[in-house]
Amino acid sequence: MNKSKLEYIWLDGYKPTANLRSKTKIMKDFDGKLDSCPMWAFDGSSTRQAEGGSSDCLLKPVCIHPDPVRRNGFLVMCEVLNPDGSPHESNGRATIDDDDDDFWFGFEQEYFLWNPETNLPLGFPKDQTPQGQF
């Protein structure tokens, strides 16, 4: 029995800038296919996507990728839906044409070389002079 970690990822309802949210579902014998990712509910009142009295929202998987960090892990990109299945007002993706393959996402990881003698980044001034205006 093989278990997989599916990290459901979506945009919350914060304005002016939405934040990434996620929660993990553990599934047995997952085949890695989008069609095998079930819809999942969450409490929208904690993400500014629903009022406290009726706070259920749905996560609809729309894209899946292997997790580059976790073994047997998958990143499941989701749209947010209302309980009736209609697109939530924070779901800007619902207005995008699904036939357009021009949209991509990626991860960026930054690295620093560290000088063990100064305990500062390599080439960084010892007096830690400000870098100046950008």
Language model regions located:
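Glycine-rich, acidic/polar active-site loops that bind/position phosphate-bearing ligands
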Residues: 1-134
